[in-house]
Amino acid sequence: MRKVIVSNSVTLDGRVDEVRDWALPGDDDEFVKHHTDLLSHSDGLLLGRKTYEFFAAVWPSRSGEFPDRINSMAKYVASTTLNDPEWENSHRIEGDVPEAVAELKEQPGQDLIVYGSHDLMHSLLEHDLIDEYQLWVYPVVLGKGRSLFKDGLERMALDLVDTTVIPPGVAILTYQSQR
């Protein structure tokens, strides 16, 4: 069965707002190396509309191992307002998003990656569809803003399965669900 892997940047205090102000840029060598490795074991992206629109504006004009991979792989967009996603190999998820993602997990293939897409992540979390979290924890404290995990979630047990530290002190922590 395919896994759903959430890969998100987060501050030390768990915030995810204004990520472009404090996270590594998409062309940083360490960023590219680690995300290219993640994508080499994946064949699909699960994206919310806002993340999709940002990615679709940035990646199609770039080339290299990471942009070429992200441009060619399947992209599944959870949106009720985006009618015709134009980025190569993009598909809008229609109807019940958690049900559609559960069906995608059952299909043969490699893992599915969720980048950003805060609302989509929470919908998948509420339906126990996330298998792994790859959190890029940055040495920044915002003190306010939207948290990665919303208040009121049920307790979840996770296992830390990998740690990597890259300059400038970013800890990449990989957790798997204990279910």
Regions found by a protein language model. Name each.
Residues 136:
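Non-cysteine beta-strand/loop elements that form the S-adenosyl-L-methionine
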Residues 1-129, 139-179:
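Portal/gating segments that form or line small-molecule/metal binding sites
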